Amino acid sequence: MEEVFKYIIGLGAEVMMPIIFTILGVCIGIKLPKALKSGLLVGVGFVGLSVVTALLTSSLGPALSKMVEIYGLELGIFDMGWPSAAAVAYNTSVGAFIIPVCLGINLLMLLTKTTRTVNIDLWNYWHFAFIGAIVYFASDNIYWGFFAAIICYIITLVMADLTAPAFQKFYDKMDGISIPQPFCQSFVPFAIVINKLLDKIPGFDKLNIDSEGLKKKFGLMGEPLFLGIVIGCGIGALGCGSWKEVVDSIPSILGLGIKMGAVMELIPRITSLFIEGLKPISDATRELIAKKYKNSAGLSIGMSPALVIGHPTTLVVSLLLIPVTIFLAVILPGNRFLPLASLAGMFYLFPMILPITKGNVVKSFIIGLVALIVGLYFVTELAGFFTLAAKDVYAATGDPTVNIPAGFEGGALDFASSLLCWGIFHLTYSLKIIGPAILVVLALGMAIYNRIRMTRNDAKEALNNK
């Protein structure tokens, strides 16, 4: 059975998800041609996103490597990037069974009415496998690994329910969809607290600029396309050791700028493919459940945050944070992690932050900045345990994507930089008995609160409809 799940996971998101969505579509009553088209569009979306992400990584890579060499930015933790982190997570004993375990937990929570999210974003289950894997290798106990993964899953489902109304209101065409992805959800506490603090600053409301406001105020210069070109050229220039080298490298500098601009322009177009493919599945699933089960109003289908990473504010803020993050990684005392490969996944910080800031570019930037500063220290602290897992997987599989260069430890912003990952790890591993007890109380408390909240909302709606 373990080999079966490893084979399915090994297909990759671009193959696994179209198959799953096609089968799911047929099972819920969609005709095969329409279900197949939906599945294939999802697959095309994943391929397109992979191509654009690879373009971003391959374009930035040489310039960033030169910056590291010129300015002596050597740090001790090698950035694996989220694809390698996912490969490590899924190739452990926890990862091999994470999908059926989490689906079982999801079903149990639906039956007990402690969630209304049906999480079909199976590829992103690797996040739960990740926290489970590092706890497993740290404690040498697979049961604690599954415990950590399950706790993370329960908390994430409740968070998805709690944030669903604001998410659906902020983003277009997202009715009935929630985001049960722990990396995105882990930044919600940062966003709520910092957003309220910023609102208390006199005059800060005058900086209420969203992506449309940038376009109106700065015209072409406020477009993500133009900002991508400018920042790309800036990074390319910083990768030169002298003015003469800058002049000699003008073609490559301009080329990097155009490629960065292309990434900013292509990502929204690619995310539209996800929406086109997933909407029929989402709508049909909600209709079927509404017919079969009473009191199913408000049900949400758990989808990938890739649906909304093309929002202009996300693109602009992510782009601005790339050079800032590199600078901070170098100057922050005690940090040993230099993010390079992880920068391509910067977009995934913001899907759940934007509904809280209402798309405000300044607020989103500040929240992202604080989250990244804290996240760099989280990655640094968890690197040793992630390295244990990566080395074990490499020894077993020989997969070069999980190989850590000699003399380095391994790390990745996604998922190691999140408060949820760091907190669950230390409460499970460092505090032994009292920590797991706290997590059980927290997870059960959130689930019970969620049930009470949803029951009250149902009662209010019933009264309003009379």
Regions found by a protein language model. Name each.
Residues 56-59, 73-74, 92-93, 183-189, ...:
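Hydrophobic transmembrane alpha-helix bundles
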Residues 58, 82-83, 265, 269, ...:
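A short glycine-/small-residue-rich loop at the edge of a beta-strand within enzyme catalytic domains
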Residues 111-115, 301-385, 389:
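Hydrophobic alpha-helical bundle architecture
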Residues 56-57, 64, 68, 382-393:
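Membrane-proximal extracellular juxtamembrane segment immediately upstream
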Residues 52, 65-68, 83, 290, ...:
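Generic preference for flexible, low-structure residues
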Residues 71-77, 97-103, 122-130, 150-153, ...:
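Mid-membrane cores of alpha-helical transmembrane segments in multi-pass membrane proteins
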Residues 1-53, 93-302, 310-312, 355-363, ...:
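Signature of multi-pass transmembrane helix bundles
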Residues 45, 49-96:
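Membrane helical hairpin/interfacial module
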